[in-house]
């Protein structure tokens, strides 16, 4: 049975490998990117990667973060695509907050959340990268505005909301297009 029957997309089930990146004291984003680079290079059969990480800080105008740039490099070097949660946050003045790194990666698909009425939720962030690339690339159901996504936790089912819960649904669709339909990364991304 499906945890979220309203979101059944007919893509079937996929085997998923989880790679934990330890967030011990003293870690930094460069350590995380180094670990991602190593994990991706050691798992060349995986072409679609879901990343749920991000900075609370907003991106700077006319710049791309080092993290976003390095993820773009990893994608190019390994012929993979990253699906990245668009980061959550609300600015103190109630305005929509700009995305945080690494959601400014140009070649990744950045995912934000909408509710079940297709309305953007309050915590979704947005931003223009290098004055030209508008992020997020796509939005999907991630809970919010009173709607929730069901997930499994150690103590049972929990009701949650966030871009980190919307991104895996897009990763599924990309995996279907690349691994089942045999489309290239570029073709799948264009769809």
Task: Go through each PLM region and give its residues.
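Subtilisin-like peptidase catalytic core
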Residues: 1-63
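Subtilisin-like serine protease catalytic core
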Residues: 1-29, 77-79, 105-107, 129-135, ...
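Solvent-exposed loop/turn segments at secondary-structure junctions
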Residues: 23-24, 55-58, 88-92, 115-118, ...
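Active-site neighborhood of phospho(di)ester-bond hydrolases with catalytic His/Asp-centered motifs
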Residues: 50-52, 82-89, 111-112
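Polar, enzyme-active/binding microenvironments
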Residues: 56-58, 62, 72-75, 181
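Catalytic-core regions built around general acid/base machinery
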Residues: 66-79, 101
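Extracellular S/T/G-rich loop segment that most often corresponds to the catalytic His/Ser-adjacent loop
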Residues: 97-175
């Amino acid at each position: 049975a499906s945890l979220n029957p309203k979101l059944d997309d007919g893509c079937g089930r996929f085997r998923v490998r989880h790679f934990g990146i330890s967030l011990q004291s003293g870690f930094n984003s460069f350590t995380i990117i180094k670990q991602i680079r190593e994990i991706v290079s050691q798992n060349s059969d995986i072409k679609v990667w879901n990343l749920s990480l991000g900075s609370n800080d907003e991106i700077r105008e006319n710049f791309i973060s080092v993290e976003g740039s390095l993820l773009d490099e990893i994608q190019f070097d390994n012929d993979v695509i990253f699906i990245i949660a668009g980061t959550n946050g609300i600015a103190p003045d109630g305005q929509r907050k700009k995305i945080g790194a690494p959601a400014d990666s140009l070649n990744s698909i950045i995912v934000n959340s909408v509710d079940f009425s297709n309305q953007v939720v309050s915590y979704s962030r947005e931003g223009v990268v290098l004055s030209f690339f508008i992020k997020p690339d796509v939005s999907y159901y991630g809970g919010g505005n009173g709607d929730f996504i069901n997930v499994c936790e150690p103590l049972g089912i929990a009701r949650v909301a966030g871009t980190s819960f919307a991104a895996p649904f897009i990763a599924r669709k990309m995996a279907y297009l690349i691994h089942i339909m045999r489309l290239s990364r570029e073709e799948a991304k264009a769809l």
